[in-house]
């Protein structure tokens, strides 16, 4: 079960860009799995269930965060992403994560989820289509828009040409 906990927490952290929200999503996924008697068997359908459920709860967390911000209930909450990197000492790592989180802030929840699963988690597109229950053309469209958003954020710093290096760095560090 430890293997799936790592996968859930990594995916949720990359989608939400927030450690606290990621931990909450991880706890809720595991509680729901226990309640529904879903057992992680190392892969296959159970792994897809955990990933699908993680993505659903992340979407709900983003929507809740956006609603709290829009209704002026909590102005300290970012609309989608809050780049909290206090635990990192390296300036380059902090800056890269902040660039990623700002790019995520400009994406729709589905764009972020598709990008994380396909690009950062290296899941095959056919499997992501099944998990998210979307068509191939919809997934391609989501990925193009997400990639364009990250490239645009990198262009602000004059680093648009370093997209592949940036993605490799994010995968390695987070």
Protein language model features and the residues they cover:
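DNA-recognition helix of helix-turn-helix
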Residues: 126-163
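Short helix-coil-helix linker/hinge
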Residues: 94, 104-112
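Arg/Lys-rich amphipathic alpha helix in sigma70-family domain 2
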Residues: 41, 52-74
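A short pre-motif secondary-structure segment
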Residues: 114-118
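Sigma70-family region 2
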Residues: 27-45, 65
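Internal acidic/polar
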Residues: 68-93, 170-171
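A short, charge-rich alpha-helical start-of-domain segment used by transcription regulators
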Residues: 1-10, 20-23, 34, 46
């Amino acid at each position: 079960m430890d293997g799936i906990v790592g996968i859930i927490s990594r995916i949720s952290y990359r989608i939400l860009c927030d450690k606290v929200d990621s931990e909450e999503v991880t706890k809720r996924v595991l509680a729901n799995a226990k309640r529904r008697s879903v057992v992680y068997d190392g892969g296959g359908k159970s792994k897809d269930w955990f990933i699908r459920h993680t993505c659903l709860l992340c979407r709900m967390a983003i929507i809740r965060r956006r609603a709290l911000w829009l209704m002026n209930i909590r102005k300290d909450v970012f609309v989608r992403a809050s780049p909290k990197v206090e635990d990192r000492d390296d300036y380059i790592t902090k800056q890269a994560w902040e660039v990623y989180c700002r790019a995520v802030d400009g994406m729709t929840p589905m764009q972020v989820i598709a990008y994380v699963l396909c690009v950062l988690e290296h899941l095959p597109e056919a499997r992501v289509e099944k998990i998210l229950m979307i068509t191939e053309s919809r997934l391609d469209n989501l990925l193009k828009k997400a990639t364009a958003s990250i490239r645009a954020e990198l262009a602000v710093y004059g680093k648009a040409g370093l997209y592949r290096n940036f993605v490799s760095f994010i995968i390695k560090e987070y």
